[in-house]
Regions:
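Flexible loop/hinge segments at secondary-structure junctions
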Residues: 1-193
């Protein structure tokens, strides 16, 4: 299938999308943020979503099986290599791999917004998701190291602007939200944003 088969204004080039397997959280996020959101924009599918949520999910959650979508496994380095070999292909993987390989590949803009640290942190780049960490309150003080782990995870050293988690690709919360999370960890309460 060619891009021009979808829209005549698109180039007559073969569609090739390299992505993760069904077991991947990145794929789950892509299905939810891109495929489901896109399906909701199609009138007949929006109607189906209201009438039969299970059927709607079966439609938007299915990847093509005609060769346009290629499961490239969990190895993001392999996807980068394949993108270098075929500059017309698209790859689905986390921002940290784009950032590490920006000399070889470029990110896709979504609604006119390029993927960047700032655009992801602000929520402006639509194809990004938050990372949630859950701890049972009943485990704090019972499971050795649980409170210490939570304290460390939200510490300035770990999650601060110059912390080791952002150095590994994590986009930290904006300061105000991070402060709320730190208070929740300290007080043993939940936080919703």
């Amino acid at each position: 299938m060619m891009w021009s088969d979808i829209d005549a204004s698109l180039p007559a080039k073969k569609i090739e999308v390299l992505g993760p397997p069904p077991t991947s959280g990145t794929r789950d996020a892509f299905v939810e943020l891109v495929m489901e959101a896109g399906a909701e924009e199609i009138e007949s599918l929006a109607k189906l979503a209201k009438e039969d949520k299970k059927a709607f999910k079966a439609v938007f959650g299915s990847m093509r099986e005609d060769g346009a979508f290629v499961e490239a496994g969990e190895n993001d380095n392999l996807i980068v290599q394949k993108l270098e070999a075929n500059p017309d292909a698209f790859g689905i993987f986390g921002y940290s791999f784009l950032e590490e390989n920006q000399d070889k590949i470029k990110g896709a803009s979504v609604n006119g917004v390029q993927p960047s640290f700032e655009a992801i942190a602000s929520g402006e780049y639509a194809v990004s998701r938050s990372l949630f960490v859950y701890a049972k309150k009943a485990h704090i003080g019972v499971i050795p190291g649980m409170q210490e782990f939570m304290d460390e995870f939200v510490s300035e050293k770990a999650m601060g602007e110059d912390g080791y988690l952002p150095a590994k690709g994590l986009i930290p919360l904006p300061a105000e939200e991070l402060s709320k999370v730190r208070d929740a960890v300290k007080n043993g309460t939940g936080v919703s944003m």
